[in-house]
Structure formats: structure tokens, C-alpha cells
Amino acid sequence: METPLLVGLELRCPPHLFNTHSRPSSSLSIPALSLRILTPTAATTSSAVIELPANVAEAPRSKRHSNSYLARKSAISEVQRSSDFLSSLQRLATVLKVQDLNVILRDFGISGRWQDLIQLFEWMQQHGKISVSTYSSCIKFVGAKNVSKALEIYQSIPDESTKINVYICNSILSCLVKNGKLDSCIKLFDQMKRDGLKPDVVTYNTLLAGCIKVKNGYPKAIELIGELPHNGIQMDSVMYGTVLAICASNGRSEEAENFIQQMKVEGHSPNIYHYSSLLNSYSWKGDYKKADELMTEMKSIGLVPNKVMMTTLLKVYIKGGLFDRSRELLSELESAGYAENEMPYCMLMDGLSKAGKLEEARSIFDDMKGKGVRSDGYANSIMISALCRSKRFKEAKELSRDSETTYEKCDLVMLNTMLCAYCRAGEMESVMRMMKKMDEQAVSPDYNTFHILIKYFIKEKLHLLAYQTTLDMHSKGHRLEEELCSSLIYHLGKIRAQAEAFSVYNMLRYSKRTICKELHEKILHILIQGNLLKDAYIVVKDNAKMISQPTLKKFGRAFMISGNINLVNDVLKVLHGSGHKIDQVQFEIAISRYISQPDKKELLLQLLQWMPGQGYVVDSSTRNLILKNSHMFGRLLIAEILSKHHVASRPMIKSRPEQKFRCK
């Protein structure tokens, strides 16, 4: 007798026990079973397959639920529907178990009842009815709306062993990744490991997914992959797919090739998504030879390139400058029905225009419009930018106006493109209209928007408006461009807006970057001109060694004449400390100011006592002025100090500039 072989089994299970969205039933059916029996002989012929009826085991059988089960299910439903769920919860607290409360918590999250979810979670905490699933679900739902609150919930977990539960950790790490906070995510992950977390494959897949979204995510991804063997984790197809996507987004084609080979060695079969990432990595340098080899390899193993791969191949050809082959491939995309939207046309138009082939790009644009290809305006944006680069501002302006009419709502990229075209064409009215349109559509300006406007306002000599726009840009957290700010500082100085110029300088200075030394000197001249000597002193104090000697001398004399008298000694010490040689004129002006204000006696005495130790002495005319007024400062003390000056002056070769400035 031949032994039958079981080759097919289908099991249909009943709904979840506490699925409150399903209709309650008083009976529970036995799962339907469908079997196909094959004998060894029948394995060679399809006619020998014997298939049993699917309803062979479907004898109805009733099952009574316990009173406890029915009470809990009713309580769940009542709390979910209640307008005052906390009161219902308090009344039914003895009936509901932790798992029941978790069902309600998840229902609140799915329904978007965020405030109710938080209140329920806090109630569960207060009553000690909480589990790993509670924390994991709550963090997941709260983190989708407020990552800071999710972190607060995680940090509030009192039990250390619960805090490093892998499911809870994965939930909070996923929240951080989805909110673009990879650095914070990695720091928290490192802390979790120190506290005893045993990460699993989900943990690493979550972190690797975050590396795709950030600049220079490749080194961090490699570091994470290096941890896998230590944690007993092997890379699977999903993880390889993520790593290949990271390689592609960072232009690491050789590394992507190595990972593909490693996959094959480990017994994984790369699929079309893995190959798509490898192909994308070739697009960075336009390596069309390797791209063609890859396409040939794929076809040889039966993989048919999809829309994404063919579009990526088009990108490779364009980057490699193969425009004839790009046109041929675009035709193939059209034939396959893969060019129903504007993206492949835009890629080719952009490549042609940047290669100086504007008319060919225009031809593609007109062809696309003629075929009625679906467009969101991105193609218009490409052409407007191309026309601006070729200084064909009139055509760019006309196309921008056409775009405004055609597309009622535009994205920020398109708005910036049209704004730039109007600015380049000098169309102030259109510029103002575009800014109003952005406000009406609640579109927040980005770095490019601000840069375009500031440059335009400077060109139109609207320097205070350019300054105000720079303030707005800085307040939004955008990084200021030094060259543009330097130009604005210069023009603000020319219109005697010295305080505004200093404000722009400070925004640059405090943006955690090194600025060119010429800018320190430029702002110093502007501040001296505006008699903003206290601000000028700050510039000199922080950057004296990067400022030329003539400019330091100019600042020193200006400060001695009209700067804050209480800072005179400090200024002289800063100038000396920078290597600047202070001349007698500056000392004479400072001493004359002190003598004219007897209440500054201590400052005069401090200056006179400091000078000999640094190699400075008063000249004869200044000495006579001091002696003449010595009764105000103490004759004996003045005589003692001046005697030290006399002793220090003996080895010196006295020199005196011809021109002297005296205070009136």
C-alpha cells in the first residue's frame, strides 16, 4: 500500500478574541480544513490528485463563552463608546484586565483619540495595570504625533529590566527614526546597550532604515552591521535591501557590488529591488557600462526590469552624457506605459539643459506637452531654471506666468523657481505677488527662497528690506551664506545703517563657523564710522590678531577720543596683547581725558603704573601735564610713578610722531 503524501494544508482561524469591531457570535466554528492527497505514483501525473471537500470537517459545534469573558468584552465596548470613559473605567476597574486595557489603548490610538490615550495610559500607571505591550503601543501611537512625549513616556519607565525590553526599545527607536532624529536615536541605542539591551533583527533594521534618510549615513550603517555577529544576528534579504539602498543614496557602487556578492555567497537570491539599488548607485557617476552589464545579468536570470529600474537606467545614461541612448530609452518607457507622468521627461530635460543643449531640452518639453503627459508643474520648473541660466529672462518670465495660471497650487520648488525668474527679470510686482501667494498657500520659505529674495533686494538697493529678510532667515534656523552677508554688510555700511550691519555680522559670527578675516576688518571700519566704539571693541577683542595694524591704530585713536572712558585701559591692554605698538598720541589722549575727569583718578593711576612694565613711558609734554595737575591725584604718588617712567626711559630711543591730537 502506498503512503499518501500531504502537500497542501489551509487553515482558516477565527477572529481575535477581543476584536470589538467584529460581530459577537455565540458559537465558534472548527477551522475549515482543505487537503490534497498525493501518492508517490500520483506525484508524476496530475490526474492522480485526490482533493477532499473543504467542508468535510465543518460539522457545526456550539461553544458557550464564560460569564467572565462576556463581562470583559462588554466592559471593553462600554469604555470605548463612553463620552466619559474615565468614569466608566473607574466603575469597571475590577472587571478589566491589563490585556483588555491594552485593547482599549490601541483602539484609541487607531482612532486618533490622542488625549484619551494619554489619560488612559496615566490611569493604567496609577493603578499598576501596565505591561510591556502597554508601553510599546503607547510609545508607538504617541510618537507618531509628539516624539518628545514618547521619549518622556520611555524615560518614565521605573523598572530597568522593562526599560531594556526589546519590544519597547524598538518602539521608541522607530519613533525617533521616523521623525528624522537619527543622532538622538543612536545615542539612546548606545545607552540601551550599556544598560543591557539585547537588540534583535528588528532593532537593526530600524536603525539602518534611519541611515537611508540622512547625509553620510553609510559609515554609521557599516558600524551597525559590524555589531551583528556579536549579537548573533545574520543579515537577511530585508537587511541587505536596506544596506544596498544606503549604498545607493551615498554613491557607494563598489560597496553595493560587494554586498550583492555577499548575499549570493550566503545563499540569498537578490531580487529586483536589490538590483535596483545597485543600479541607482551607478547613477552618481553615470557608470553606464556597469549599468548595462547589470541589466544583461538580470535578464539572464529571468528578472524583468520594472518601471523604477528603467527610469534609474535613464538617469545613469543622462549622467553619463549618453543623450541619444537616453532618448531611445525614453521611447521604450513610453511604449511600455512607464512614461505616463513627467518625471522621465524632466530628467532628460534637466540633463540636456545643464549640458548646454537648451533647444533640445525645449524640444523634449514641447513634445511632452503635446502628448498630454500628466504634470504637476515640475517640467515647467526645469525649463524656467534652464532659461534663467541662459539669461533668457523674458521667456522665463512668460513661462512663469503661464505656470501660475495653469497650476493653482504649486510646491515650494516650483514657487522658488518662478520667484527666481521674476527676480532675475526685475519684476518687482510679480515678486511681491509670489510672496503673497506663498503666504496664502501657507508655504514656508526654505533656504533657497530667502537666498533668492536677499540677493534680489540688494540688487534693487532695498538694503533694509534685505536686512529684514536676513533676520527672518536666521530666525527660521537657516544657515547664512557668508558671501551674501558680506555684500549686505558692505551696503548697509554705505547707507549708514551700521547697527544693522553689525547685527548681520553677529548672526554670522555666532553660527558656529569660521568667517574670513577680511570681514572682521570690514565691520570694524563700519563701526568706527558710525561711532559704535563699544561694538568695535568687541570685534577687536575677539579678532585683534586678524586685523591689520593701520586699522587697529585707527580704532585705538577713535576709542581714546570718544570711547567709553571706563574701557580705555582695557582697550589699550587688548591692543598691546595683540602685538600692536601703541603710540604716544593714544596715551596722551587717554591721560588728558582722565585728567579732565578727576573722579577717574584710579584709572589714571592704573594706566601710569601699567605702562613701564610693557615698555611704555610718557613723553615730556604729557609728563608736564600730569605734574601740573598732580595736586588732584596726590603729588607724592605721582612723583613716585613718574620717577619709574624716567628710569624706564633711559635705555629707550625716544621717538615722537610729528602730528599730535589733543582733547579739547
From Swiss-Prot:
GO terms for cellular component: chloroplast. PANTHER family: OS07G0661900 PROTEIN. InterPro entries: Pentatricopeptide_rpt, TPR-like_helical_dom_sf. Belongs to the PPR family. P subfamily. Keywords: Chloroplast, Plastid, Repeat, Transit peptide. It comes from Arabidopsis thaliana. One of its GO terms (biological process) is chloroplast RNA modification. Residues 1-72 form a transit peptide. It is found in: Plastid, Chloroplast. One of its GO terms (molecular function) is mRNA binding. PPR repeats lie at residues 165-199, 200-235, 236-270, 271-305, 306-340, 341-375, 376-406, 411-445, 446-480. This is Pentatricopeptide repeat-containing protein At1g10910, chloroplastic. It comes from the Eukaryota. Pfam families: PPR, PPR_2, PPR_3.
